[in-house]
């Protein structure tokens, strides 16, 4: 609803797509896994109630704001519960090498962003995009299906971690130029990248996101190739700054990844619009 209030003010320069993630991949498998698993984060998992809850939430957003949202395809077999309501899908860093994620992405009729893996190997991401852009025959939900290929499959840069667990960003000018070169050699359709300003790109320093976002737009001013390749930014934002445990009790504060709050988000949206 807050984004809706400023959408019309920036619509000639920016397209806003709310990022509503209903599943949460966990590095160790421990912790809150999102509304799909636990519609009530303080109760036991209930995936039937979770499926109903995530669909109702996306429907409510459309009904009250007109926004169709982005979600992560953590479980390919569950995508059809939301396929009629989403405008964007992301395949995460831990899923991007998975065959079923790639093949399912090839059958979707909306943009699908493929993140670079946590290792940072861009060839893995590019191979995933290639697979998603080609037609396939495969088994999905116990049916043999055929896909036509998804020409809107594209890259998401989210940073990586080295063998010592240190984060390595890949949002800088030089990183995007390398991706431009990979795309030029690939022959892929509709070259595009969305850049994640959090995760390993921020070193999980959530409050660095505004600076990172503005640096990316600065890079687009110094290279036509980058200007044409960068289609968007993925920003983790909510109502309050930071995050809390599921039983923290602060309304509007994330119970998963730390986010920038609404005041910073609103300011950043206007600043990005002015830079366009």
Residue spans of the language-model regions?
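Active-site-facing alpha/beta catalytic cores
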Residues: 7-178, 199-200, 204-215, 219, ...
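Extended serine/threonine-enriched, polar tracts that run as long, contiguous segments within proteins
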Residues: 190-191
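Mid-to-C-terminal alpha-helical segments outside catalytic/metal-binding sites
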Residues: 262-267, 276
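Redox- and metal-dependent alpha/beta enzyme cores, enriched for Fe-S-associated oxidoreductases
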Residues: 179-184
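Short helix/strand-capping connector loops at secondary-structure junctions
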Residues: 244-256
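Short, small-residue-biased leader/transition segments that mark boundaries at the very start
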Residues: 1-6
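Conserved, mostly hydrophobic/aromatic
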Residues: 195, 261
């Amino acid at each position: 609803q807050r984004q809706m209030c400023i959408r019309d003010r920036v619509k000639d320069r920016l397209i806003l797509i709310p990022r509503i993630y209903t599943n949460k991949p966990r590095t160790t498998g421990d912790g809150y896994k999102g509304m799909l698993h636990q519609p009530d984060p303080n109760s036991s998992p209930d995936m039937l109630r979770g499926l109903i809850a995530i669909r109702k939430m996306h429907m409510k957003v459309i009904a009250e704001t007109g926004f169709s949202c982005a979600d992560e395809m953590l479980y390919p077999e569950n995508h059809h519960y939301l396929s009629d309501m989403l405008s964007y899908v992301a395949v995460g860093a831990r899923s991007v090498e998975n065959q079923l994620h790639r093949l399912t992405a090839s059958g979707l009729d909306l943009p699908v962003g493929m993140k670079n893996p946590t290792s940072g190997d861009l060839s893995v991401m590019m191979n995933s995009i290639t697979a998603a852009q080609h037609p396939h025959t495969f088994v999905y939900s116990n049916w043999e299906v055929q896909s036509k290929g998804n020409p809107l499959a594209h890259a998401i840069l989210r940073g990586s971690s080295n063998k010592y667990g240190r984060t390595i960003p890949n949002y800088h000018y030089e990183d995007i130029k390398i991706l431009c070169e990979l795309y030029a050699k690939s022959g892929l359709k509709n070259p595009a990248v969305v850049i994640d300003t959090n995760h390993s790109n921020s070193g999980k320093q959530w409050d660095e996101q505004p600076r990172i976002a503005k640096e990316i737009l600065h890079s687009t001013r110094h290279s036509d190739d980058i200007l044409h390749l960068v289609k968007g930014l993925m920003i983790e934002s909510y109502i309050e700054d930071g995050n809390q445990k599921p039983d923290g009790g602060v309304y509007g504060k994330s119970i998963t990844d730390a986010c920038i709050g609404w005041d910073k988000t609103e300011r950043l949206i206007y600043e990005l619009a002015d830079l366009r």
